[in-house]
Amino acid sequence: MSTWLLPENIADVLPSEARKIEELRRHLLDRFRSYGYEMVMPPLLEYIESLLTGGGHDLNLRTFKLVDQLSGRTLGLRADITPQVARIDAHLLNRQGVTRLCYAGNVAHTRPRGLHATREQIQIGAEIYGHAGLEADLEIQQLMLDALRLAGLAKVRLDLCHAGVLAALIEAEPAAAELGQSLYDALAGKDVPRLVELTANLTPVIRDALRALPRLYGDASVLDEARARLPNMPAIARALDDLAFLASQVDGAEVMIDLADLRGYAYHSGVMFSAYVDGVPNAVARGGRYDHVGQAYGRARAATGFSLDLREVARISPVEARSSAILAPWQHDEALRVSVAALRDAGEVVIQALPGHEHDLDEFAFDRVLVERSGNWVVEPRA
């Protein structure tokens, strides 16, 4: 086996792709800051007990585990930054009011989440803590759509779901609670035959409601059908009202309702949402409310947020990231050195062509050149 062979679904990021990813990262973090979000940087490794707190079965399966050579305890290589940020808010910052936090960093998955998906994502996201009202959910959704627009993804479809619907049905039927992960997997995968099999022995009202969820998909009018087909429970009524309000407020995206889009249900407690674009089978961004996660770290806090994979969004983004630059010669000239330094201080990209390599610079678009005119170095358009 070649010594330079990388593991499956792990890849290097080469200059052109890396430049596009980094430019997008900077733009998104600047936009998050314009909304008032503060940057945090959780560690790549944590003790497994802390890393998986409140994360559910799926997060456990996706997390690489190793032994700490100092303590002998098990460490986890993070697969999701969101629970780490919840820990920071609940345990370290300990603020009483609304807190807005954002982050960007690498995460690793034991298995790819799609056929061609990478197992090392660059996750970027934003979270609001301390406000239980729908205003926070709406702000997060607007910020996510704003981020996707910055990436050049204009035609976005926003799918809305609510964890409270399934939670209410399970709470009303103890036998449904015993089905646990199998029921969730069947719903998330829209595996209707499996769902029929699992619900065969449930009471008719709960059985029919669970079987209806995969079919409750469409525009906002599907909420009227949901009210007719689902049991008249206060929790379900509130969930459907929340979805109706948010669907009416979203600007700049097609809104769809999908009451079986339950990926991430394990730690979500309210509204859940996913963003899709044409030509990409999987969601390009996901988010939702997870009010109970902070409680696992010692302090219950209302929380909602979203995240996306920078590598995937940069890959599908039509925004051109080829950097324009100034081409300068390589000479032992003090005036040239001063001119180049001044241009770089002003934010310009200046590349000095090393002798014999004047044509090895295809990664950059040289629209200007630095030339000597009457003893002065000046920037001119490149012919």
UniProtKB/Swiss-Prot annotation:
GO molecular function: histidine-tRNA ligase activity
Coiled-coil annotated residue ranges, if any: none
Gene3D superfamilies, per database record: Bira Bifunctional Protein, Domain 2
Cellular component annotations (GO), alphabetically ordered: cytoplasm
Keywords in alphabetical order: Amino-acid biosynthesis, Cytoplasm, Histidine biosynthesis
A GO BP entry: histidyl-tRNA aminoacylation
This protein's record includes keyword S-adenosyl-L-methionine: no
Highest taxon in the source lineage: Bacteria
S-adenosyl-L-methionine keyword on record: no
Subcellular location: Cytoplasm
Pathway(s) of this molecule: Amino-acid biosynthesis; L-histidine biosynthesis; L-histidine from 5-phospho-alpha-D-ribose 1-diphosphate: step 1/9
Record's subunit section: Heteromultimer composed of HisG and HisZ subunits.
Family the UniProt entry places it in: Belongs to the class-II aminoacyl-tRNA synthetase family. HisZ subfamily.
Purpose: Required for the first step of histidine biosynthesis. May allow the feedback regulation of ATP phosphoribosyltransferase activity by histidine.
NCBIfam families, per database record: hisZ_biosyn_reg, PRK12292.1-1, PRK12421.1
Note: This function is generally fulfilled by the C-terminal part of HisG, which is missing in some bacteria such as this one.
Protein's name in the database: ATP phosphoribosyltransferase regulatory subunit
Gene symbol of the encoding locus: hisZ
